[in-house]
Amino acid sequence: MKILHTADWHVGKVLKNQPRIDEQKLVLRDLVRVANDEDVDLVVVAGDLFETAAPNPQAQALVMHTLMALREGNRQVVALAGNHDNQKLVQEVYAPVLGQLGIHVIGTPRRPDSGGTLTLDTRTGERAIVAALPFLSHRYAVRAAEALLHDQSQHNQDYANKMRGIIELLCRGFTADSVNLVTTHATLLGGRWGGGERAVQTLLGYEVPPDVFPASTHYAALGHLHRYQEIGGPCPIAYSGSPIALDFGEEANQPVALIVHATPDSRAHIRPVPLTGGRSLATLRGTLDEVVAAGAEAGEAFLRVILTQKASAGLADQVREKLPNTLDVQIDEKFRARTDSTVTRSRIGRTPTDLFADFLAEREVEDPRLGAMFAELLEDST
């Protein structure tokens, strides 16, 4: 069986006021091309279809059309909700509508007999059993454990054990003569965030160990971390990463789709296939003259410029005039006057999440976990 694994599309992403939708149209068109060229039997989209919980019509249309294009040729398609997605919208609107076209969409955790475990017969006659678990926050993990496991004693266990129990339940239908797959949107211990090579450290107990996946799993298709990577465990495990570099912390990432070959009696083989269409990102650091000189080598990349000189009137405008692809101009902290704060951005029309992202960017904090934590705390408080 040939499987295409992708995740973290984040359709509707806006980077420093620059919409990425045109790039996303190109890269998702390329993703469909890969599915066709590779003649895959099954496509798995492991969460974060959208950038926000309230995607605009253009973003929704792109996701819908891409999923339908992937379905062409009678290939099976499975798509999950991630932490950026509106899970109720995905479950109550997209799942029934796209389900009429044979596309399997899972927005909220389901019991095995209600869509949590899918038995899919491919066009080649092979059978896949897919245990599908959308993103689970702490507060929903307790609720999901109660609904799926019917065990009140589970409520006091930590997040990882709740995930383990739910995944074990969803995998009970695995058989010896099927290709057994797990797909979820989660953070595994040992994974690396898209913005650097740091080992993921425990943060609010969200990480789960790779051994939550049973050894009978032929392949675990993950979403949430934006860098392509394989994780050691009892079965082949991989993150496909995002098909475009979403932020400047991810500028070194190489966008790919994963082609996975799996049979009931062999270990899955994973092969990354490069995706095109997204513009690269680059950070230039130096004086005005230095970054302008370096910009000649940056091509069409979107730029973040960090100036190692004192601020002066019109400096940012000079940068943008000489480097039109510049999205962000900062003064290196060493050159900022003690009384000088970073440029105040207008709050009109900007969400608290946007303002917090600006706050992190101004301090060169590149850790997507903080943004996710802020968004969850904001949701809990409103």
Segments from the language model and where they lie:
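Active-site neighborhood of divalent metal-dependent phosphoester/pyrophosphate hydrolases
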Residues: 10, 40-58, 75-89, 188-204
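Conserved catalytic scaffold of divalent metal-dependent phosphoesterases
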Residues: 96, 100-203, 263, 274
